[in-house]
Amino acid sequence: MANWDHPTSKVRSTVLGLPEQVRACLFDLDGVLTDTASVHAKAWQTMFDTYLYQRAKHTGENFVPFDPTADYRQYVDGKKREDGVRSFLGSRGITLPEGSADNSGDVETIYGLGNRKDDLFRQVLKEHGIEVFDGSRRYLEAITYAGLGVAVVSSSTNTRDVLKITGLDRFVQQQVDGITLREEHIAGKPAPDSYLRGAQLLDVAPDAAAVFEDALSGVQAGLSGHFGFVVGINRTGRVDQAEELRRIGANVVVTDLAELL
């Protein structure tokens, strides 16, 4: 562990695992700072399987369940809810009306299914709480002490609540979340727009900011936004996932942010 008595650019680059020019860090939330990616995957699985099962009964088609690993990672991870619903259903050749953001969860529209998933996610959070990765908390403490800007950039509409419940809000200077994306009409990941907005709020150029992501769509956003550094987080430790994160744009891949300290 480094001596933090006099944080400098050299300390930032050598101890925080970042290039010297980086002045701000933009973090995804689920799977990067908090152990909520598995909760999201379970909520997506429950919502989609219920819908697909009922659809199969009605149409006579075979019921093929949602894969909480492969389908989650390929179609919904890191994306706005409506984009995730649209992407996965499209992979099954299913088209639904768009509906509107105020559709209740029992309405079979793109927004309705997305809201049903959000209801399930909130229920799990209420019953089981939220865990913060210890290495992520330590890394946030270190970069805060070093004077780097911190923003959370997430597609989740629950971001503010999660940050407050976990106490991570004390590290975060700015946030761009699912509510921001909807209100400001910002394109979701893999478009870089949400991360570009985060950098703008911290008043730094993209090439002076690092992006921290576990989702393929988020790493793609970091690459296409021309950010100074992209850190891929591979919680599974699987070699193929690490290689995929590198292939699509991660400069470095770690299993835990503490590896950068």
Curated annotation (Swiss-Prot):
Tell me what reaction this enzyme catalyses: beta-D-glucose 1-phosphate = beta-D-glucose 6-phosphate
One MF term in GO for this entry?
Answer: isomerase activity
| Keywords on record | Carbohydrate metabolism, Isomerase, Magnesium, Metal-binding, Phosphoprotein
Cofactor(s) the protein requires to work: Mg(2+)
Q: Where does beta-D-glucose 6-phosphate bind?
A: 30, 78, 81, 156, 158
* Family matches, as Gene3D superfamilies: HAD superfamily/HAD-like, Putative phosphatase, domain 2
Is the keyword Kinase assigned to this protein? no
Residue numbers binding Mg(2+): 28, 30, 214
What InterPro entries would the database entry show?
Answer: B-phosphoglucomutase_hydrolase, Beta-PGM-like, HAD-like_sf, HAD_sf, PGP-like_dom2
Q: Which residues carry this modification: 4-aspartylphosphate?
A: 28
- Active-site residues are 28 (nucleophile), 30 (proton donor/acceptor)
Q: How is the cofactor bound?
A: Binds 1 magnesium ion per subunit.
Looking at its record, which EC class is this enzyme?
A: isomerase
Protein name, please? Beta-phosphoglucomutase
